[in-house]
């Protein structure tokens, strides 16, 4: 399921009166987040299987990002942080993205694109040659789903760098590691 975009975060959400968006560098993650495509305002939040999780009228919902979601129940909170970061890198033509599994194994796109796949190995996971080299976005999405299956808030927290509260910028995130844990991405900042 991929809702159709109607506008962007920057277009829909103006800074509060008396505030201005914090300047961001061109081509930065923060700038890319400001231009996230949003679905129409009446779009509900849907689960991976199409079920409505939250009605569009739910007061907790400000907007729905117009991106596809895997048909498997994989993209959770920390995964969404990694997904947006990876999609930003992809949009810039960068292919050096790498995330970590909960067990610590590095999960770089470069290995997946060479035809390797992640498989269980006892209590751990490992890379094995199992496919053909791939380089398109559909293969990249399959790679991300594999990352989502093996990464979590704990592994994301281990890759993160702490930020002082007065230095928070778009692209930073709050994380409560654990099982299940939680992560929330900062999409924009105004001062």
Task: Show which residues each predicted segment covers.
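N-terminal module-boundary/linker segments of secreted carbohydrate-active enzymes
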Residues: 1-58, 68-76
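Phenylalanine-focused residue identity feature
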Residues: 13, 19, 29, 140, ...
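Acidic/His-rich structured neighborhood in mature extracellular/periplasmic domains
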Residues: 55-169, 175-183, 187-191
């Amino acid at each position: 399921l991929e809702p159709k975009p109607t506008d962007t975060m920057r277009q829909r959400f103006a800074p509060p009166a008396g505030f201005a968006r914090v300047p961001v560098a061109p081509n930065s993650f923060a700038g890319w987040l400001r231009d996230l495509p949003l679905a129409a305002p009446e779009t509900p939040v849907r689960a991976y299987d199409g079920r409505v999780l939250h009605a569009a009228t739910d007061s907790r919902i400000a907007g729905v990002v117009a991106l596809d979601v895997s048909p498997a129940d994989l993209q959770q909170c920390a995964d969404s942080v990694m997904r947006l970061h990876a999609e930003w890198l992809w949009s810039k033509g960068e292919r050096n993205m790498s995330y970590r599994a909960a067990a610590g194994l590095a999960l770089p796109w470069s290995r997946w694109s060479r035809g390797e796949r992640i498989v269980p190995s006892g209590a751990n996971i490992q890379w094995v040659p199992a496919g053909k080299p791939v380089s398109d976005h559909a293969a990249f999405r399959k790679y991300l789903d594999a990352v989502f299956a093996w990464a979590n808030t704990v592994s994301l927290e281990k890759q993160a760098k702490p930020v002082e509260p007065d230095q928070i910028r778009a692209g930073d995130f709050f994380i409560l590691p654990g099982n299940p844990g939680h992560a929330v991405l900062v999409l924009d900042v105004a001062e």
